Amino acid sequence: MATKIRCTDEVIVLTGKYKGKRGIVIAIYSLGKAIVSGINIVKKHQKPVPALNKTGGIIEKESVIHISNLTIFNTKMNQADRVSFKTINGKKVRVFKSNGQTIN
């Protein structure tokens, strides 16, 4: 089954601490989770590894967020939108539900 949200899509967060924030999807995992740039920032306490010449400290990085808390952002209409699928020339493509425009 094709996913409605893919890597490099611009999404908006629907619920939680980051509600209303937008970001670009960096990675999608099989358990229905995604990493979005600038969203769900956590602090990781990293130990130094002298053998690999890595310094320790507190590192801020993006953590996973469930896909059900995200929706795709339609930049043409400047609002959150839903996704449907259509078959065009024998190919299954994603389209916005509000205006029927294809998503690249």
Curated annotation (Swiss-Prot):
Keywords: Ribonucleoprotein, Ribosomal protein, RNA-binding, rRNA-binding. Transmembrane segments: none annotated. Pfam families: ribosomal_L24. GO terms for biological process: translation. GO terms for molecular function: rRNA binding; structural constituent of ribosome. It comes from the Bacteria. One of its GO terms (cellular component) is ribonucleoprotein complex. InterPro entries: Rib_uL2_dom2, Ribosomal_uL24, Ribosomal_uL24_KOW, Translation_prot_SH3-like_sf. Part of the 50S ribosomal subunit. PANTHER family: MITOCHONDRIAL RIBOSOMAL PROTEIN L24 (PTHR12903). One of two assembly initiator proteins, it binds directly to the 5'-end of the 23S rRNA, where it nucleates assembly of the 50S subunit. One of the proteins that surrounds the polypeptide exit tunnel on the outside of the subunit. Belongs to the universal ribosomal protein uL24 family. This is Large ribosomal subunit protein uL24. It comes from Baumannia cicadellinicola subsp. Homalodisca coagulata. The lineage of its organism: Bacteria, Pseudomonadati, Pseudomonadota, Gammaproteobacteria, Candidatus Palibaumannia.
